[in-house]
Amino acid sequence: MSILTHRPRRLRKQEFNRSLVRENTLSASDLIYPIFIIEGENTREKIDSMPGIERLSIDQLLIEAKEIVDLKIQAVALFPVISSEKKTEEAEESYNSDGLVQRAVRALKRSFPDLAVITDVALDPFTSHGQDGLIDSNGYVLNDETVDILIKQALSHAEAGADIVAPSDMMDGRIGAIRNALEESGFIHTNILSYAAKYASSFYGPFRDAVGSSGNLGKSDKKTYQMDPGNANEAIREVELDINEGADMVMIKPGLPYLDIVSNVKQTFGVPTFAYHVSGEYAMLKAASQQNWIDEKSTVLETLLCFKRAGADAILTYFAKDAARWIKDS
């Protein structure tokens, strides 16, 4: 038998070997927890398509935030559920200074000043038609007119105390417009997390159920502004545009089916790159684990580690609390 000079298995034999040479690790500080918020008091509503996730009134949000802080998770992302009577074609409620998001931000920053609060800048929770922008008589989403509303929305979030505003709408030029407005208004330290590469994906269904936009959207889609799932080079162009317009971080959405995009963006630009482990991905893992087809803990932690390996600096995931507990207990 010939002598083997290289035996890669030597570094896999024992746990200390594997731990010492592990290239990527996962910690609670890598995770961002998305939270759905609703009007009312002492209210928690289950979401059928997202087992374990609830819509929370602001008082319950503060209870949740205490747990999040104790788990060493450093950031939350807020997504509002707006009542139908407040939804309009012009999405005026999106920039109401006393709106649900704005009040939630103020409450969080008063009670947990060191917890980073990320707000979603998009109009779909606020429009009667469920699109992310204003529409013309043919239902086509109007770009520049929508950007004008997004600026107002982002400013209202910054005024409330949001640490990071996150435009997820995919309108052209909105990052530069929002950055200019923030600078001119004195919000020079407000971060912009751009959903720079957001695909027209089938994985968003449970999210739309959660925020109540699926019924408004009906049989329409968002393919005229969200990206085609078949495109990779386009993602690089979109990210480059947003970086040049003033984005501090960029988001790839969805996550797991688009790890190639996460990797390409990180390798190409070297900027803070986040990934969104979206509602459909969460629902699939939850459903499989509830049927005992997979082990939830090991599968989720492996999935999140894969995001890190691909180059993600942070992961927005509905498993954040569970993962943080598992990491803490390991």
Predicted segments — roles?
Residues M1-R22:
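N-terminal amphipathic/basic leader segments beginning at the initiator methionine
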Residues S2-H6, L26-I32, I38-S330:
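Alpha/beta enzyme core
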